[in-house]
Amino acid sequence: MAAPGEALTPQGYIQHHLTNLHVGEGFWTWHIDSLFFSVGLGVLFLWIFRSVGKKATSGVPGKLQCFIEMIVEFVDNSVKESFHGRNALIAPLALTIFVWVFMMNFMDMLPVDWLPWLASLAGVPYLKVVPTTDVNITFSLAIGVFVLIIYYSIKVKGVSGFVKELTLQPFNHKAMIPVNLLLETVTLVAKPISLALRLFGNLYAGELIFILIALMYGTNLLLSSLGVTLQLGWLIFHILVITLQAFIFMMLTIVYLSMAHEDH
């Protein structure tokens, strides 16, 4: 990092924006900024939806209530179309995942320097404001889904049914049990890994593009003008990206849990 009062090089600027505020080292490193924004946005989500739910009226609803009802109906329809079991938890879980992941993704729409600059005034050297650009956060979400997959697989099918699913598919012969176990284990473990890395990769790349565009403002008038156009264009396109990634994470969660409820 550059010394106080010294301008960052382009490489240093990029590295600075991609570094988390953290404590500890190695495996025991805590990314304070990722935890703060993810938990804070989760609490904000609960507060908004609880407040709207308590004030909901059967009369003419307000704009916020209409918006919330539209989201709830959209998620509920998605669950009905993709989840083929019976579980009252799935719809609330899907709603939580969709809105929470979207809110974390939406932090990427803020100008890359605003919050880090404000934090620097308080003596905070680093601040990453997009939790889903931290692979630890995306893996935490994916592992939570993975635990539910295992739990419902055993609950619905029983321990013996779950073991049979791992050992007697796709080849229903005892001699193929080792091959089946290897294939099914890889398939099972790939679910949380793909969930986590897909979300992380798309948001990390999006954040990096915003950072690269921001570098153009410190060059010359021509590139600065081009930077404004590029930033506006990428901002509009990125609205689709952050929404789509939240939707994909939600839909894959619904599909995986639906598969866990299937009793072969």
Curated annotation (Swiss-Prot):
Q: Which GO terms describe its molecular function?
A: proton-transporting ATP synthase activity, rotational mechanism
Q: Which GO terms describe its biological process?
A: proton motive force-driven plasma membrane ATP synthesis
Physiological role: Key component of the proton channel; it plays a direct role in the translocation of protons across the membrane.
Q: How does the protein's chain sit in the membrane according to the entry?
A: Multi-pass membrane protein
User: Can you tell me where the transmembrane regions are?
Assistant: 29-49, 87-107, 134-154, 177-197, 208-228, 235-255
In the UniProt record, does the keyword Membrane occur? yes
Specify the superkingdom: Bacteria
Q: Which GO terms describe its cellular component?
A: plasma membrane; proton-transporting ATP synthase complex
**PANTHER family documented for this protein:** ATP SYNTHASE SUBUNIT A, CHLOROPLASTIC
The family annotation for this protein states: Belongs to the ATPase A chain family.
The UniProt keyword set, sorted, is: ATP synthesis, Cell inner membrane, Cell membrane, CF(0), Hydrogen ion transport, Ion transport, Membrane, Transmembrane, Transmembrane helix, Transport
Q: How does it assemble?
A: F-type ATPases have 2 components, CF(1) - the catalytic core - and CF(0) - the membrane proton channel. CF(1) has five subunits: alpha(3), beta(3), gamma(1), delta(1), epsilon(1). CF(0) has three main subunits: a(1), b(2) and c(9-12). The alpha and beta chains form an alternating ring which encloses part of the gamma chain. CF(1) is attached to CF(0) by a central stalk formed by the gamma and epsilon chains, while a peripheral stalk is formed by the delta and b chains.
Taxonomically, what lineage is the organism?
Bacteria, Pseudomonadati, Pseudomonadota, Gammaproteobacteria, Alteromonadales
- Designated name of the protein: ATP synthase subunit a
Compartments where located: Cell inner membrane
